[in-house]
């Protein structure tokens, strides 16, 4: 008898630091709660679950019953917890010592809540740079999942239905390739089509899926499709009935199967990033949006000041503010606004102001100083007076880069210039972003839609 296909099913849950409570509560009602409730009714379905630390803390405070449900499924072995950065930073974009602290913070949060330590990590936005390998390895994390296109770009051919290994400075990390086919089928195609696609995987190999849980209820039309019309219930029932499919957690598959071999990946992120930025590397957002680069370099400077303090003075409140300022959401944009959303940028500046004020109480800065704050080769002048911090750029006629009021935790110079975006062409022509991927029956992925809450004049 042939060996079954091993379905590795992972979901990732995250809400931006600084998001509105009512938005998170709606996500719980329309996505997190019904997904977990449906999953618990199907104990033969194994899932690897990543929840960002900031969101996990929120759920534990406001929705303890859902956290208790996770704990029950952990104890039964139905799910495993996946680690990562606590506030969902792009690991490649923050200093190594902060990477390790962020990874440790979520590991400890999971240990304290559930009594387990994760062995795998979620890479924020699946941004890959080899520099993250030692940080992950030394943090006790042994595997990550990235898009299968990452491995294709490294020259791997053939079926991507197992995991590979890489190393940096002699420290190994294993890499699971996420199937693009499954990402575009789940949850948009009929459940029968999804099961058929999984069953086409060769015997004994892995069908690998890991993607945002918010696709299951928050993305357009998905709540009705996934829950009210019973798509998720049907999918789990069909998987359980299949003689070809056996679900496993990533960790169990990792323990029981050998690596396919060594691979070295180029610096990259997921395929869709090319729709928002040519080149597909996340760090290039900092070049396209100088406002994001300013926040990023200000956060890096605050990190250096924090780590320059004696260990005994590095308060937990400082580290928390630093970690919150490193949350990825306000530094770039994809489908959901990101740097274009003022409240996400405001969250970064609020946490920077909190951290700077605490640092100044221990290590005051001079009233004025010249330095290249944003590392673009041109000096800025930083001014401090009373409750205010200001940064001026002489090379641009004395332009004000930042005017932060510490008591208000607000930067009054936090504005964003309007820029032409490539995807405006889709808006102008009123078409689908990916007409070649549109299929019936089922529902359209958000990547294939052109829809707006308000009218846009590109």
Locate the predicted segments by residue.
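Acidic-aromatic substrate-binding/catalytic surfaces of carbohydrate-active enzymes
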Residues: 25-29, 97, 101-104, 386-458
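Short, well-structured secondary-structure segments
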Residues: 5-95, 101-102, 117-123, 142-148, ...
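Positively charged, amphipathic and often flexible ligand-engagement surfaces
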Residues: 90, 149-160, 176-189, 193-194
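Generic structural signal for well-ordered alpha-helices
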Residues: 32-39, 67-71, 100-110, 133, ...
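CE4/NodB-like, metal-dependent polysaccharide N-deacetylase domain
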Residues: 96-125, 196-213
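Gly/Pro-rich turn-and-neighbor structural signature
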Residues: 97, 112, 116-117, 122-166, ...
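Active-site and substrate-binding clefts of carbohydrate-active enzymes
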Residues: 2-33, 40-42, 160-173, 177-181, ...
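Alpha-helical scaffolding within the catalytic cores
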Residues: 33-34, 61-76, 154-167, 191-198
């Amino acid at each position: 008898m042939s060996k079954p296909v091993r379905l590795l099913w992972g979901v990732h849950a995250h809400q931006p630091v600084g998001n509105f409570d009512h938005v998170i509560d709606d996500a719980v009602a329309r996505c997190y709660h019904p997904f977990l409730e449906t999953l618990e009714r199907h104990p033969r379905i194994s899932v690897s679950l990543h929840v960002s630390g900031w969101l996990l803390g929120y759920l534990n405070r406001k929705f303890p019953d859902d956290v208790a449900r996770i704990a029950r499924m952990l104890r039964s072995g139905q799910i495993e917890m996946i680690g990562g950065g606590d506030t969902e930073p792009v690991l490649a974009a923050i200093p190594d010592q902060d990477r390790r602290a962020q990874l440790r913070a979520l590991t400890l949060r999971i240990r304290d809540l559930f009594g387990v330590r994760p062995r795998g990590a979620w890479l924020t936005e699946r941004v890959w740079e080899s520099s993250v390998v030692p940080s992950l390895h030394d943090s006790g994390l042994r595997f990550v999942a990235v898009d299968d296109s990452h491995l294709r770009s490294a020259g791997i051919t053939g079926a991507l239905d197992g995991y590979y290994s890489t190393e940096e400075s002699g420290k190994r990390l294993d890499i699971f390739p996420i199937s693009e086919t499954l990402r575009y089928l789940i949850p948009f195609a009929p459940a029968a089509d999804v099961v058929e696609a999984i069953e086409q995987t060769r015997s004994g190999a892995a069908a690998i899926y890991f993607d945002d849980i918010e696709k299951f209820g928050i993305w357009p039309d998905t709540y009705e499709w996934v829950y009210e019309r019973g798509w998720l219930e049907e999918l789990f029932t069909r998987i359980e009935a299949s003689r070809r499919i056996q679900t496993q957690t990533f960790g169990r598959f990792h323990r029981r199967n050998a690596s396919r071999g060594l691979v070295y990946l180029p610096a990259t992120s997921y395929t869709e990033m090319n729709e928002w930025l040519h080149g597909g590397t996340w760090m290039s957002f900092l070049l396209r949006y100088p406002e994001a680069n300013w926040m990023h370099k200000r956060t890096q400077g605050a990190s250096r000041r924090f780590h320059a303090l004696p260990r005994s003075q590095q308060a937990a409140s400082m580290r928390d503010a630093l970690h919150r300022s490193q949350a990825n959401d306000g530094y770039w944009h994809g489908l959901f606004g990101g740097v274009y959303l003022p409240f996400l940028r405001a969250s970064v500046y609020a946490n920077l102001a909190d951290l700077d004020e605490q640092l100044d109480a221990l290590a005051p800065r001079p009233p004025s100083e010249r330095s290249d704050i944003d590392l673009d080769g041109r000096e800025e002048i930083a001014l401090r007076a009373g409750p205010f911090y200001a940064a001026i750029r002489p090379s641009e006629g004395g332009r004000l880069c930042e005017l932060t009021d510490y008591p208000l935790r607000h930067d009054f110079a936090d504005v964003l210039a309007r820029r032409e975006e490539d995807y405006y062409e889709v808006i102008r022509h009123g078409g689908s972003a990916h007409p070649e991927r549109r299929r019936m029956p089922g529902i359209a992925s958000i990547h294939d839609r052109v829809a707006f809450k308000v009218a846009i004049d590109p």
